[in-house]
């Protein structure tokens, strides 16, 4: 289930973004990037519709995924 980021409380969204960034350990190359900048990058991706927040009832977990990945997964689930 997709959770619209706009419907989350600002503190909840920020905590989710920080948790995601810390969990992912995204590599930014040779340059050190601050936690605030990483959070801002993911927030921008949400605002631009490039990423979405997904809740899994099965795993009772929340994740942030690229929208393109989600679109491909939905197409793959369509029976032929």
UniProtKB/Swiss-Prot annotation:
Domain of life: Bacteria
InterPro entries given in the database record: UPF0270, YehU-like_sf
SUPFAM superfamilies recorded: YehU-like
Family: Belongs to the UPF0270 family.
Protein name as it appears in the record: UPF0270 protein AHA_0994
């Amino acid at each position: 289930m997709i959770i619209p980021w706009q419907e989350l409380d600002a503190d909840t969204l920020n905590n989710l973004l920080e948790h995601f960034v810390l969990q992912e350990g995204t590599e930014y190359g040779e340059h050190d990037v601050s936690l605030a900048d990483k959070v801002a990058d993911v927030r921008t991706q949400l605002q631009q519709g490039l990423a979405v927040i997904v809740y899994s009832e099965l795993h009772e977990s929340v994740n942030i995924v690229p929208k393109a990945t989600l679109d491909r997964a939905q197409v793959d689930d369509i029976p032929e």
